[in-house]
Amino acid sequence: RECVEVRGIEKMGRGAVDSNLVFIDGLVVPDADRIGAEGEGFRMLLDTLNPERILIAAEAIGIGRRALDKAVNYANERKVFGRLIGQNQSIQHPLAESWMALEAANLMVWRAAKLYDEDQPCGAEANAAKFLAADAAYEACDRAVRTHGGFGYAKEYHVERYLREIMIPRIAPVSRELIMCYIAEKVLGLPRSY
């Protein structure tokens, strides 16, 4: 344990899950305890990222759906000038678009999960699922806040929390930009850009 130091990270969200910096210095790993060949650990780690991307995508869908449900419920209850705000197309259309985007992204999540479960290559699908789900969910969360107007900024309605929580699927375990690089190179056959 003297070779390992753990430091907590304060975050804007994800209070239920610890995040830490782990420093390992001077730790000797006997050959018998090593997994795989020396220097191949990072390559082995990359193979574990597909299920993580699928999981993060499914999480994003759940957060987006919850935010959308909150927005729809609020739009069906809130009256302004004697009229439900949900009667206005400027409220309806963004929420309808979010529902469609979330459902489309969810199909890619299920496609990626099916391929993974069948032990098939799923890098493109896992990356696409994560990209599409994170974007669709972010839009749904942003629209939920805006549907609530000033109350969207208040903790009482919880939509501000969903907007904070959806940031992780947008940036982890891989950024949107790196996903686009992966798709461009591995799926479309374009030259490597980095």
Task: Please name every model-derived segment.
Residues 72-86, 99-132, 145-153:
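C-terminal helix-coil-helix/basic helical segment that borders enzyme active sites and/or dimer interfaces
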Residues 92-93, 126:
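Short alpha-helical transmembrane interface motifs in multi-pass membrane proteins
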Residues 120, 127-194:
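Alpha-helix capping/hinge segments and adjacent helical runs
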Residues 38-41, 108, 162:
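N-terminal alpha-helical segment
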Residues 45, 71, 112, 163-167:
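Short alpha-helical scaffolding segments that buttress acidic/His motifs in well-ordered protein cores
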